[in-house]
């Protein structure tokens, strides 16, 4: 999907805020800890290349989801280490060696498939993924980890790192977190040779479990100024939200009592009202369940009336405003603010999803 720069809807990305968040987090973790910036999913909707270029001097490497995201960074001139967190296809090994990527190895079957196809593994760098309780990918038994490490090293692979991912680091109870941590430590203790890099800390672990950090952290949601727990846990220190979503009024009218708005005529004015149209809709990631949520105009909360359409929403204004008046969907307007977490709470989801769903049709502007 191409960006639509000829309409007022845009996402403003404060790159300085992201850098400040990295520095803030860095000040609260053990000195010498490597900082890996997670820029997968287009940097959580913020723009992977622009963000990576802005922060490359503040971090020690990058994490992405798949090899295509990694190639995008390399082709944009980013030279720092890139770890691909997901399982890669067998055909990706040659690309990983060509572009100097680090692959994740999560199972013996994957290694055996490479050996069966006689893929040249010499010079490949990998991290071993441990499934300590997340349940997605990774080795679950110490014996499998030992076998994998031996096989890889026998075929010229550099096993540089080992890592896991916590499922509940952003929740109030530590019970499951501690159980995962112990499983991971048990596997580490069983290894004849522990890889150089050991990392288990995502944003939530970095914020609320700093005492469990090994020698690297993966900075994701928090790097963009978002609270990984939503509204469950208070941040231990201030972070600056980096993304503002705004648009403008493109049509304003006064309608009589009884006038209906949107598909299904689900909203009917109970009096004479001022209704405005804003060019954003579910094709932009502003989903249909946002009906009745309020956006900000002139520092005032204005409810979305009628269903969210593919490309447009209608809002109720307290009075007529000129065409072009700014509408804030995420961010500050006057003395009021809408956060991604507030949007997520309304949708019964998480702030990660809110920013990741913002489509490419919305131009990103950086400052």
From Swiss-Prot:
Protein residues bound to substrate: 136, 310
Pathway: Amino-acid biosynthesis; D-alanine biosynthesis; D-alanine from L-alanine: step 1/1
Stored InterPro entries: Ala_racemase, Ala_racemase/Decarboxylase_C, Ala_racemase_C, Ala_racemase_N, Ala_racemase_pyridoxalP-BS, PLP-binding_barrel
EC numbers, comma separated: 5.1.1.1
Required cofactor(s): pyridoxal 5'-phosphate
Biological process per Gene Ontology, one example term: peptidoglycan biosynthetic process
Known catalytic reactions: L-alanine = D-alanine
Modified residues (N6-(pyridoxal phosphate)lysine): 40
Catalytic residues identified in the record: 40, 263
Gene Ontology terms: cellular component: cytosol
Keywords: Isomerase, Pyridoxal phosphate
Example GO molecular function: alanine racemase activity
Role description: Catalyzes the interconversion of L-alanine and D-alanine. May also act on other amino acids.
NCBIfam families the record matches: alr
HAMAP family in the record: Ala_racemase (MF_01201)
Family: Belongs to the alanine racemase family.
Protein name (record): Alanine racemase
Native organism: Streptococcus pneumoniae serotype 19F (strain G54)
Gene: alr
């Amino acid at each position: 999907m191409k960006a639509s720069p000829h309409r007022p809807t845009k996402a403003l990305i404060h790159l300085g805020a992201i850098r400040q968040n990295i520095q803030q987090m860095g000040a609260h973790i053990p000195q010498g800890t490597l900082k890996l910036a997670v820029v997968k999913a287009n940097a959580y909707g913020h723009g992977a290349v622009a963000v990576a270029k802005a922060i490359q001097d503040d971090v020690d490497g990058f994490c992405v989801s798949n090899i295509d995201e990694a190639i995008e960074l390399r082709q944009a001139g980013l030279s720092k280490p890139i770890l691909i967190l997901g399982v890669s296809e067998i055909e990706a090994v040659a690309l990983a060696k060509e572009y100097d990527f680090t692959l994740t190895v999560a199972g013996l079957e994957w290694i055996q498939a490479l050996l069966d196809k006689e893929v040249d593994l010499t010079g490949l760098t990998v991290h071993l993924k441990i499934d300590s309780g997340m349940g997605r990918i990774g080795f679950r038994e110490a014996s499998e980890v030992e076998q994998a490490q031996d096989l890889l090293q026998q075929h010229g692979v550099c096993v540089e790192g080992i890592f896991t991912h916590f499922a509940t680091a952003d929740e109030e109870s530590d019970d499951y977190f501690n159980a995962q941590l112990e499983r991971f430590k048990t596997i580490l203790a069983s290894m004849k040779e522990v890889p150089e890099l050991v990392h288990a800390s995502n944003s939530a672990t970095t914020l609320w479990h700093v005492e469990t950090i090994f020698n690297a952290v993966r900075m994701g949601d928090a790097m963009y100024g978002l609270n990984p727990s939503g509204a469950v846990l208070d941040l231990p220190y201030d972070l600056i939200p980096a993304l503002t979503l705004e648009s403008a009024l493109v049509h304003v009218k006064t309608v009589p009592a009884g006038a209906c708005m949107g598909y299904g005529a689900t909203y009917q004015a109970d009096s004479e009202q001022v209704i405005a149209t804003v060019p954003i809709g579910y094709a932009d990631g502003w989903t249909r369940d946002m009906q009745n949520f309020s956006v900000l105009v002139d520092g005032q909360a204005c409810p979305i009336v009628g269903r969210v359409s593919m490309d447009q929403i209608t809002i109720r204004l307290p009075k007529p405003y000129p065409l072009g008046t700014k509408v804030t969907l995420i961010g500050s307007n006057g003395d009021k603010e809408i956060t991604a977490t507030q949007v997520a709470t309304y949708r019964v989801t998480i702030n990660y999803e809110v920013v990741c769903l913002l489509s490419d049709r919305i131009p990103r502007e950086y400052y």
